[in-house]
Amino acid sequence: MPRLQKNDNFIDKTFTVLADIILKILPTTKEEKQAFCYYRDGMSAQSEGEYAEALENYYEALRLEEDPYDRSYIIYNIGLIYASNGEHIKALEYYHQSLELNPRLPQAFNNIAIIYHYQGLKAADKQDNNMSKSMFDKAAEYWKQAIYLAPNNYIEAQNWLKTTGRLNNK
């Protein structure tokens, strides 16, 4: 069943209808329209926890989409799925790829920082102080980038940077 028919959330339905209208009036290619439909279906599946279906849709959208900016969001969402599945190394790869295409994507910087922070906590639990410090320092650098791009966001990260003395470290 197409994802469109499964969607019963009013806001999602409204977004879908508006997106379809915009796609009809904007001068876009058939591939761009198809890519957007796959991307939209991927987001819908992802929001329902249907990660395998979401990945299928995202990979198809990626195959069709040529615009680097739009590709960055598709790749970023693929990273989100891998992170949700605990595949942090793979998630990092996709977040970095999204930043190569769109270096002004604060959420990718934030999610990279979250993974490094998590790895720092795990290393601290194992009493591996060198690894813990290294991971926390990496997290700090990525959070600084996220905060630079979106200064009103990531308040918890800002507080962590302040309390750990990493806010002004270069």
From Swiss-Prot:
Subcellular location: Plastid, Chloroplast thylakoid membrane
Organism (species): Gracilaria tenuistipitata var. liui
TPR repeats: 35-68, 72-105, 120-153
Alphabetized Gene3D superfamilies for the sequence: Tetratricopeptide repeat domain
NCBIfam families: PRK02603.1
Protein name in the entry: Photosystem I assembly protein Ycf3
Annotated keywords: Chloroplast, Membrane, Photosynthesis, Plastid, Repeat, Thylakoid, TPR repeat
Membrane disposition: Peripheral membrane protein
Main location: plastid
Keyword Repeat carried by entry: yes
Xref: PROSITE patterns: TPR, TPR_REGION
Similarity comment: Belongs to the Ycf3 family.
SUPFAM superfamilies, alphabetized: TPR-like
Purpose: Essential for the assembly of the photosystem I (PSI) complex. May act as a chaperone-like factor to guide the assembly of the PSI subunits.
One cellular component term from this protein's GO annotations in UniProt: chloroplast thylakoid membrane
Keyword Cell division applies: no
GO BP terms, alphabetized: photosynthesis
